[in-house]
């Protein structure tokens, strides 16, 4: 199963690289010599960029299967929301509100 997954990942990368190469066809068409030369020069520059990008795609390492992020996601997916009890209707006055009112009186 692991070899099959690796093979499928390699095929996906190769399809992406092939798509990149198909988006940059060799320039065709009429024009003066300088226009044709400039089109070829721009095409060659784009081609070098595509080759560099394809190399990065091909050599980019795959993330490990049990990365901390995936473990965290699996843990979060296991969480459920439980029904909480109704809050109490009469709350005692908190000590923080007493402290803040005493401080205001001192100022």
From Swiss-Prot:
A motif (Nuclear export signal and binding to XPO1) lies at residues 71-82. This is Protein Rev. Transmembrane segments: none annotated. GO terms for molecular function: DNA-binding transcription factor activity; RNA binding. Homomultimer; when bound to the RRE. Multimeric assembly is essential for activity. Escorts unspliced or incompletely spliced viral pre-mRNAs (late transcripts) out of the nucleus of infected cells. These pre-mRNAs carry a recognition sequence called Rev responsive element (RRE) located in the env gene, that is not present in fully spliced viral mRNAs (early transcripts). This function is essential since most viral proteins are translated from unspliced or partially spliced pre-mRNAs which cannot exit the nucleus by the pathway used by fully processed cellular mRNAs. The keyword ATP-binding does not apply. Residues 20-40, 82-107 are annotated as: Disordered. Pfam families: REV. One of its GO terms (cellular component) is host cell cytoplasm. Its main location: host cell. It comes from Human immunodeficiency virus type 2 subtype A (isolate ST) (HIV-2). The RNA-binding motif binds to the RRE, a stem-and-loop structure present in incompletely spliced viral pre-mRNAs. This region also contains the NLS which mediates nuclear localization. These overlapping functions prevent Rev bound to RRE from undesirable return to the nucleus. When Rev binds the RRE, the NLS becomes masked while the NES remains accessible. It is found in: Host nucleus, Host nucleolus; Host cytoplasm. Residues 16-24 are annotated as: Homomultimerization. A motif (Nuclear localization signal and RNA-binding (RRE)) lies at residues 35-49. InterPro entries: REV_protein. Residues 21-34, 91-107 have a biased composition (Polar residues). It comes from the Viruses. GO terms for biological process: mRNA transport.
């Amino acid at each position: 199963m692991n070899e099959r997954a690796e093979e499928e990942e390699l095929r996906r990368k190769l399809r992406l690289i092939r798509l990149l190469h198909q988006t940059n066809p060799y320039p065709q068409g009429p024009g003066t010599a300088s226009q044709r030369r400039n089109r070829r020069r721009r095409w060659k520059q784009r081609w070098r960029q595509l080759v560099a990008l394809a190399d990065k795609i091909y050599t980019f390492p795959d993330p490990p299967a049990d990365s901390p992020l995936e473990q965290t996601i699996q843990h979060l997916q296991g969480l459920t929301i439980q029904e909480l009890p109704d809050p109490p209707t009469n709350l005692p006055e908190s000590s923080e509100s007493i402290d803040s009112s005493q401080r205001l009186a001192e100022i």
